[in-house]
């Protein structure tokens, strides 16, 4: 049995495409570090690795097999959600706001109640690290607003045409679904082949996400990363939701 590597500053991650799980007893765990070092997130995401851990743990770096992904044009927009989107678009008090107050979206995700889990993995360190990515143009947020009040949203990471969905939340019925519908429509319009959802949940499956083999995911990821010079314009409004109507 191989040991899971403990990474220091500037130490490279093992490549999940060419390396077996270091410890068969903890499938998908590829590395551990004391903290998130500068540049680590960029290196990790480009290898299909992401951090997921709690406050009382070291940083755990994962690349699960299978990998949950959403093909953007396979987003399941039910008849009831379509009705919600029509009302949302028609109501002048409602809006989609992109890339404003990124850390507020992260904090909302962290405090969101979820069945069977909590948001403790969105630690202060995680908020700081992803806010730094946002400031570099590598992370983005979508906020769902109702009369100026934040009622839902999500945040994601973007390298080239690779989109990694991180977390979402609702404070009002369908708040997170509206945000994901907007992100999915944006991806369809920009030729983004898939949204990484990382781990399987019943909620994501109900919205069209499905698991694929890690190898398939990583091969597709490399193709998307090769389009890193493509600059996406994250400047859209709720009118993007018309895609599903």
Question: Which residues make up each language-model segment?
Answer:
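N-acyltransferase acceptor-side catalytic subdomain
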Residues: 1-245
């Amino acid at each position: 049995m191989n040991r899971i590597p403990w990474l220091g500053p500037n130490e490279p991650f093992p490549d999940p495409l060419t390396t077996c799980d270091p410890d068969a007893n903890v499938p998908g765990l590829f590395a551990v570090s004391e903290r998130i070092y500068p540049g680590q997130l960029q290196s990790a995401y480009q290898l299909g690795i992401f951090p997921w851990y709690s406050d009382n743990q070291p940083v755990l770096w994962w690349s699960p097999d299978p990998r949950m992904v959403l093909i953007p044009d396979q987003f399941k927009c039910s008849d009831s959600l379509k009705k919600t989107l029509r009302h949302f678009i028609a109501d002048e008090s409602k809006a989609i706001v992109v890339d404003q107050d990124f850390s507020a979206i992260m904090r909302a995700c962290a405090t969101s109640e979820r069945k069977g889990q909590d948001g403790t993995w969105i630690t202060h360190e995680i908020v700081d690290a992803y806010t730094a990515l946002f400031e570099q143009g590598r992370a983005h947020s979508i906020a769902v607003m109702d009369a100026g009040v934040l009622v839902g949203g999500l945040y994601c990471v973007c390298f080239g045409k690779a989109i990694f969905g991180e977390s979402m939340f609702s404070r009002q019925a369908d708040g997170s679904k509206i945000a994901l519908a907007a992100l999915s429509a944006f991806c369809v319009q920009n030729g983004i082949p898939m949204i990484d959802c990382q781990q399987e949940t019943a909620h994501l499956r109900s919205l069209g996400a499905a698991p694929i083999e890690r190898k398939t995911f990583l091969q597709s990821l490399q193709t998307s990363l090769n389009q890193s010079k493509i600059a996406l314009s994250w400047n859209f409004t709720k009118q993007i939701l018309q895609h599903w109507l």
